[in-house]
UniProtKB/Swiss-Prot annotation:
Involved in unsaturated fatty acids biosynthesis. Catalyzes the dehydration of short chain beta-hydroxyacyl-ACPs and long chain saturated and unsaturated beta-hydroxyacyl-ACPs. It catalyses: a (3R)-hydroxyacyl-[ACP] = a (2E)-enoyl-[ACP] + H2O. This is 3-hydroxyacyl-[acyl-carrier-protein] dehydratase FabZ. Its main location: cytoplasm. The active site is at residue 57. The gene is fabZ. It comes from Sinorhizobium fredii (strain NBRC 101917 / NGR234).
Length: 154
């Protein structure tokens, strides 16, 4: 008998650092609280006031840039790809973005959840639908594409 805890995986910061090449200040996923094989994942970003982009976006009313929400989605998707295709031997390139929508601002103190679901995979091309949520409310969404390449071919 399997319950959700045994079927779904997670990734703490150390595992994310093994899966992704990103490092501070561009690592935008603090933890992955749920990974369902190569089908879906939920990544977490705890937004803090001392992140470098807030010094200029905007000093009097800091708002997380939308492009960084998209990057957090892409990094969560990249973790799915890296786990499935082999850590260390491949690179995951963010390829496409479609249907991006920004619904509400994300500010310091928010906890963003990146909900990423694989829509299709053909060869080394993966497509995902992504939602970013704060307190259960949709703040951004996009469809993104990724390409898996061997480090030898990169």
């Amino acid at each position: 008998m399997n319950d959700a805890a045994t079927v779904l995986g997670t990734a703490d910061l150390q595992e994310i650092l093994r899966l992704l090449p990103h490092r501070y200040p561009f690592l935008l996923v603090d933890r992955i609280i749920e990974i369902d094989d190569d089908n879906s994942a939920i990544g977490i970003k705890n937004v803090t006031a001392n992140e470098p982009h807030f010094t200029g976006h905007f000093p009097e009313k800091p708002i997380m840039p939308g492009v960084l929400l998209i990057e957090g989605m892409a990094q969560t998707a990249g973790a799915i790809c890296a786990r499935k295709t082999g850590i260390g031997s491949n690179l995951v390139y963010f390829m496409t973005i479609d249907n991006a929508r920004f619904r509400k601002p994300v500010v310091p103190g928010d906890r963003v959840e990146f909900h990423v679901t694989k829509q299709k995979q053909r060869g080394n091309i993966w497509k995902f639908h992504c939602d970013a949520k704060v307190d259960g409310q949709l703040v951004a969404e996009a469809d993104i594409g990724a390409m898996i390449v061997s480090k030898e071919d990169a």
